[in-house]
Swiss-Prot record:
GO function terms (MF aspect): ribosome binding; rRNA binding; translation initiation factor activity
Subcellular location: Cytoplasm
Record note on quaternary structure: Component of the 30S ribosomal translation pre-initiation complex which assembles on the 30S ribosome in the order IF-2 and IF-3, IF-1 and N-formylmethionyl-tRNA(fMet); mRNA recruitment can occur at any time during PIC assembly.
The organism of origin for this protein: Lactiplantibacillus plantarum (strain ATCC BAA-793 / NCIMB 8826 / WCFS1) (Lactobacillus plantarum)
Main localization of the protein described in the UniProt heading: cytoplasm
SMART domains linked: S1
Protein name, UniProt field: Translation initiation factor IF-1
Length: 72
């Protein structure tokens, strides 16, 4: 997937699911399923319900995404 096709949006973690998946409520009110990016996994960054995150989404499937940043 090319970098230009990615949609970046802010959201809040609502629920933790098995296999490092999360329910994320986006700023626009939509709720999506998101997984953790490799860099976050590599550096053992903890993501808990209530955390503010940045999510990358593909324009082809707006129900799934990848968490790329957790705000401090």
């Amino acid at each position: 997937m090319a970098k230009e096709d990615v949609i970046e949006i802010q959201g809040t973690i609502k629920e933790t699911l098995p296999n490092a998946m999360f329910k994320v409520e986006l700023e626009n009110g939509a709720e999506i399923l998101a997984h953790v990016s490799g860099k976050i996994r590599m550096h053992y960054i903890r993501i808990l319900p209530g955390d503010k995150v940045t999510v990358e989404m593909s324009p082809y499937d707006l129900t799934k995404g990848r968490i790329t940043y957790r705000f401090k």
